[in-house]
A protein has these predicted regions:
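Cysteine-nucleophile active-site neighborhood
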Residues: 1-37
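Catalytic beta-strand/loop cores that center a nucleophilic Ser/Cys/Thr
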Residues: 34-82
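Conserved active-site and cofactor/substrate-binding residues in soluble primary-metabolism enzymes
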Residues: 3, 48, 95, 99
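Acyltransferase
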Residues: 84-119
C-alpha cells in the first residue's frame, strides 16, 4: 500500500491500488472527438464494447475515449492513444467492432514494415 514502482514511462501518471473495485462492469468505448492520434486505428461513432474490473486507478487515466455504462447515464474519459497504440484499463471485446480489430492488425503490419525498412 502506498508504494510506487517505475514502469515503462510511456504514460506520465502514477497507478495506485484502491480499497474496492473501480469502474467495474460492462462499458461501451467511443473515441473522443479531439483524438486525431487514434483515427488511424479507430473511427469515432463506431464504438467498441469492453469491460473493466480492477482495484487500481491512476492519477491520469487518459482522455482518448469516452466510456459509457450500458444502463444509466454514467460515463468517464479514459485511455491514451499514441503512435498507433491504445492504452488503458478497459479490456476490449473485438467482435463488437471487427473493423477496429482489422485496423489494429493493419497498424501492426505497417509498423513491422517500417522497422524492416530501417534495418
Amino acid at each position: 500500500e502506498g508504494k510506487t514502482y517505475p514502469m515503462a514511462g510511456v504514460i506520465n501518471a502514477v497507478a495506485y491500488r484502491t480499497e474496492k473495485l473501480g469502474r467495474f462492469g460492462y462499458i461501451t468505448l467511443d473515441l473522443n472527438e479531439e483524438q486525431a492520434e487514434a483515427r488511424n486505428i479507430w473511427q469515432q461513432g463506431f464504438p467498441v464494447r469492453a469491460h473493466e474490473f480492477h482495484y487500481f486507478d491512476s492519477t491520469d487515466p487518459g482522455s482518448a475515449c469516452l466510456a459509457k455504462k450500458p444502463a444509466g447515464k454514467r460515463s468517464w474519459s479514459c485511455s491514451y492513444a499514441k503512435d498507433g497504440s491504445l492504452m488503458g484499463f478497459p479490456h476490449l471485446y473485438y467482435y463488437s467492432n471487427p473493423m477496429f480489430a482489422f485496423r489494429f492488425l493493419e497498424n501492426c503490419m505497417a509498423k513491422k514494415l517500417e522497422r524492416e525498412k530501417v534495418s
